[in-house]
Regions:
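Solenoidal tandem-repeat scaffolds enriched in leucines and small polar residues
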Residues: 218-301
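Glycine-centered tight-turn and secondary-structure capping sites
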Residues: 118-125, 174-180, 223, 279-282
Length: 321
């Protein structure tokens, strides 16, 4: 302890024996998996030879797909997730090892790590999948995974809710930010009708409220446009004045940050971007949703300016933006 006194029999086994026991459980399958992870981790993205082509037109022929084919595909995805799930000893916690691109473009590498707590590349998306799966096919093992993920997400929200400092450094977006958990809880409530997801929606929106004033991205993925959409969804379910006021505050901030040409320049962008994920059309869509609710003309005007900027980047010859 802090006074240098040894506390005997605190741990059930020594660190050495724990590691030894873990090694004895490993199989050839584990060796193959670890070899793949090592190979991926040591490979730089720019060492791979990609053929870059401009797709001028995509032709798709609609083919009718029967229910059995859809079900078969769903079950293949489910089996893959179930096979690769990593559970705690008591099965109350679960996660997966994912592969993600990281680093600057010139020195980008693959990162091998557990899924994070955001929707874009983390546990929330898997939770939504298993919630929908359990609603349709009703199986205890699907619900067990949903409960395990929910436990991890609730723990994260509780920690963020109680955090006094540092929250302003987090992203606010609806896919790679704190609003992604709010959006996830909203969806999980719709799928399960369980009140605990409403409880945590109300906690998470308080977390989001501490972050939105520091946003420097503005977009759907990382920034306040995404947060705005999640908050508008919350207001639709619970029309409390404070949620509307939060949405209006974000909308006003987005208008204030809009450039003269109608676009938005995020923290890491040299220029104003186009597109729904990081660019003007996504931000404009969020503002349009706010206008549809409030009927405040300024949000509609700002959204139109954003769409006009987006369309100014269209290249008719390439058939693309």
């Amino acid at each position: 302890d802090s006074r240098g006194k040894a506390i005997h029999k605190y741990f059930r086994e020594s660190s050495f024996h724990y590691v030894e026991k873990k090694i004895k459980k490993l199989s050839r399958k584990d060796m193959t998996t670890q070899s793949i992870y090592l190979q991926i981790a040591l490979t730089k993205l720019n060492e791979l030879d990609f053929e870059q082509r401009v797709m001028r037109q995509v032709k798709s022929e609609h083919k009718a797909v029967d229910k059995s084919t859809i079900t078969k595909s769903i079950m293949l995805i489910t089996k893959c997730l179930m096979d690769k799930a990593i559970f705690s000893d008591d099965k109350s916690d679960v996660n997966w090892i994912g592969v993600f691109a990281g680093g600057e473009s010139e020195n980008a590498t693959w990162q091998v790590r557990p899924l994070d707590n955001y929707l874009y590349e983390g546990l929330p998306g898997v939770a939504i999948f298993f919630a929908a799966l359990n609603k349709i096919f009703s199986d205890d093992k699907y619900n067990q995974i949903l409960e395990g993920i929910s436990k991890a997400l609730f723990t994260y929200t509780d920690e963020m809710y109680l955090r006094q400092r540092g929250s302003e450094n987090e992203s606010s977006g609806v896919f790679c930010g704190e609003a992604s958990l709010l959006y996830t809880y909203e969806i999980l409530y719709q799928l399960t009708s369980e009140e605990k997801y409403i409880t945590y929606s109300k906690k998470q929106i308080e977390v989001v409220s501490k972050i939105v004033n520091s946003d420097q991205y503005f977009d759907i993925i990382y920034g306040n446009a995404g947060a705005l959409l999640a908050i508008l969804n919350m207001y639709k379910v619970f029309p409390e004045k404070k949620y509307l006021e939060m949405a209006i505050s974000i909308g006003d901030s987005l208008i204030e940050k809009q450039e003269k040409n109608g676009g938005w320049k995020g923290k890491t962008s040299a220029n104003e971007l186009a597109g729904f994920s990081h660019g003007a059309s996504g931000i404009s869509y969020a503002l349009y949703r706010l206008w549809h609710l409030t009927k405040e003309k300024k949000y509609c005007v700002s959204a139109k300016r954003g769409f006009l900027f987006e369309n100014s980047l269209y290249d008719a010859q390439e058939g693309n933006w």
